[in-house]
Amino acid sequence: MSTQAGGRLVRREGYRVIPDKNIYIPPSISPEAKALLGALGQAKTYAMEFPAPDDVVGWEKMYEVAEGANKEKSEKALAASGATVTELEMGGVVVEDIRPHGWTDNGKVLVYVHGGGYCLFSARSTFADAAPMAAATGLRMVSVNYTPAPRARFDVIQRQIVAVFDALIDEGYRMSDLAILGDSAGGAMSASTVLNLRDQGKGMPAAAVLWSPNTDLTSPDDSTVTLDPADPILTYSTLLTTGAKAYAGDVALDDPRVSPLYADLSRGFSPVLIVVGTKEMLLSSSVRFYQALEAAGQTAKLDVYEGMWHVFPQYDLPESRVAVAKSAKFVTDHLNQ
């Protein structure tokens, strides 16, 4: 898409211009990452105009637009992976049951909670995000098609994810046979799921992997402000705020039910790997959650990548392949203990 006309930015329907974005391309990242970052930086000159947090009809229209935009990418990833994907209902919740190419049943399952600012995308349209971990782990993956906000608020969405775990337990799995992966908003919801399972006395998954999690909806913390101009994916004044409010509804944004950073982590948490890049606004969110977990005596690892951006493991980059391999090893090591 062209972002300029006669040397000036032009308005596009449904978008607003962000004149202060300055996407620096560091020499320290791979050539592949440099090329993609350049393309992302050009596209980020514009930001989509999102509906008000309580505008259900407006968000449904936006949801359909996002689904259509992601459809081809998801279908290509599915075809390239050779995985088998079946739509099922588990605990009253629709899921995509992913069996990677060459899958053999080892009695373990990785549950995936997709991102999308709490309001966008589905389990089907985010297959490209799930595919790398399916291939790297060789595990059966169950991607949860939760109801997006504001059609559902945080409590309904979290109950849906817990219901999928309950259904897996009913199938005969133990909690120690299960792990959870989430990215962005899905990373925050994955953390909340661990806490909900713990608080309901159901145990906790053997491992949790969180890619670029949004653990504190109150923001702005340091990187939310300082990295806003440099982030090629997120903009604080758009989805990062409106999506959070749509998800939380009438609940305060610092409520631990929506911001897991403020939860009582001393009572337990799954062994967790947090993956984040230095070029994303949620860097502070990841660092702070890691420090809170460590201070509470939990097993936590923070894996930070030079020059990488929001949920970078989903891309086909050298840095992404390293992050996915380490994420997969973390999951399989803990599932096999």
Give the role of each language-model region:
Residues 122-123, 129, 142-177, 315-322:
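Catalytic nucleophile-loop/oxyanion-hole region of alpha/beta-hydrolase
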Residues 268, 274-276:
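Short beta-strand/loop motif that positions the catalytic acidic residue
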Residues 195-254:
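Hydrolase active-site cap/lid region
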Residues 316-337:
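Catalytic active-site module of serine/aspartate enzymes centered on a nucleophile-bearing elbow/loop
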Residues 1-103:
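A glycine/proline-hinged amphipathic helix-loop "lid/cap" segment
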Residues 106-116:
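Short beta-strand element of the alpha/beta-hydrolase
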Residues 95, 111, 133, 154-217, ...:
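Short strand-loop-helix active-site module centered on a catalytic nucleophile
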Residues 94-108, 261-266:
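Short beta-strand-to-loop junctions in surface cap/lid or active-site-entrance loops
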